[in-house]
Amino acid sequence: MSKIISQDKIFLEKEGDDYFERNGPSVNQAIYKAIKFLRPKKKDTIFEIGCGCGSTLKKAQENFKSQVWGIDTSKKAINYAIRKHKLKHVFTDTFLNFTAKNKFNIVVSGGFLYVTPDKVLPKTINKMINSVKKDSYLVIWDYDTPVSYENSWKYNNKVKSYKRNLVNIILKKHPKLYLVSKILSLKNGKKLDSYNNSINIDNILSVMIFRKIS
């Protein structure tokens, strides 16, 4: 079994559930604000990769009446989404293994790229972009660094985490995407109002909104 497959398997078998238990059923405010910024309509479809227990999708569904889909590697989180939030289109799976029948108006990458190995990152990004309808949007919430490097994940030493300059990686290969917005924040969710060399780049996340123009 390859290292790439085993990392996915670790999340499906244990780490996905452990992540849900550590973080609980909270709304990801950074992602929700990005969705709100795009003002989805009732007929629009939203697909979140790494949706957790669906709290963010549920809030978007209630406030915008949009149709929502989601996947996550945590069985416990998806069961919560079905039982508590009454979401119908949520599934336990990895993104590369999941097959969607349709494309979406908004695709959200909910913080899973930093545990996506380098060898499958191009395939993953391509699939995300292909999941977005023309003239629609890709939202990415993830770690954001000026250089690429990897760490051992502190919760499981068998898992690697990857920090990258995602905007450069994405726009270099996909010039027909347009960067609408990028907002930096720290791990605690606090927005960065200034930037200097004293900031630990390992703690920086960003919300990036891309428009697919063709």
Short names for language-model regions:
Residues 111-115:
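Short catalytic micro-motifs in class I SAM-dependent methyltransferases
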Residues 108:
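A conserved beta-strand element that flanks and buttresses the S-adenosyl-L-methionine
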